[in-house]
Each structure stands twice: as C-alpha cells, then as structure tokens.
Amino acid sequence: MRKPIEHTADIAYEISGNSYEELLEEARNILLEEEGIVLDTEEKEKMYPLEETEDAFFDTVNDWILEISKGWAPWRIKREGNELKVTFRKIRKKEGTEIKALTYHLLKFERDGDVLKTKVVFDT
C-alpha cells in the first residue's frame, strides 16, 4: 500500500507491505507511475544483495533510477536465496516526471505487527 504525503519535495509517499520485497514493489510502482513509463518486452536481469536495511533499500532504488535513465525499468522482483533478482524491461516511452534520486529523508523502517512501513522522498 502507498499513499502520497505532503512534503516540500516534489514526490513523497508513505509505503507499507508485509515484507521488504513488498516495499521494493511499492517503490517500483511509484517510479513507473510518476515517470509515466510504458514498457516494451525486451528484458534483462540484475541481482541485488538481500539485506533488509534502509541502506540497501536506498542503494537498490537509486540503482533502479540510474537504470531508468539508461532506458531500463524494474519490472519483476523475486527472492532467490540471499539475493533479489530484478527483471528489467526496456522502456518504450516516458510521459511523466523524471525522478533523479531517492533521498534518505524520512527513510526509516518501522514494524507495526506484520506490516513493514517507511516514507520515501524523491528528488525531481
């Protein structure tokens, strides 16, 4: 789940899920929707360490933003042992706001029962 939050940044959300992977999926959805990305069918894969920390989340999402700038968008996220396999799809077109980076501002994982949540603030 995600909901926009008021912030001085152009794009900020509170996101939640039952797992670290679900938080990453929400971040991916924000990137795809805010940037207005239309995907093609050509794919490539990339592996990421599965470390359920704010630092790893920050690094992973910012790497995705770099990949988007190169014409590839994260599409599928799958846990494989102690790594995450992310399948990227070639970007056909972008019609939204360019996101430059995820910031550390308000990025703090919190557990509420089975729900993991944080806030994400993006620079545009």
Curated annotation (Swiss-Prot):
GO terms for biological process: tRNA processing. GO terms for molecular function: metal ion binding. Ca(2+) binds at residues 7, 10, 123-124. SUPFAM superfamilies: MTH1598-like. InterPro entries: Archease (IPR002804), Archease_dom (IPR023572), Archease_dom_sf (IPR036820). The keyword rRNA-binding does not apply. Signal peptide: none annotated. It holds the Pfam family Archease. Keywords: Calcium, Metal-binding, tRNA processing. Belongs to the archease family. Activates the tRNA-splicing ligase complex by facilitating the enzymatic turnover of catalytic subunit RtcB. Acts by promoting the guanylylation of RtcB, a key intermediate step in tRNA ligation. Can also alter the NTP specificity of RtcB such that ATP, dGTP or ITP is used efficiently. May also act as a chaperone or modulator of proteins involved in DNA or RNA processing. This is Protein archease. It comes from Thermotoga maritima (strain ATCC 43589 / DSM 3109 / JCM 10099 / NBRC 100826 / MSB8). The lineage of its organism: Bacteria, Thermotogati, Thermotogota, Thermotogae, Thermotogales.
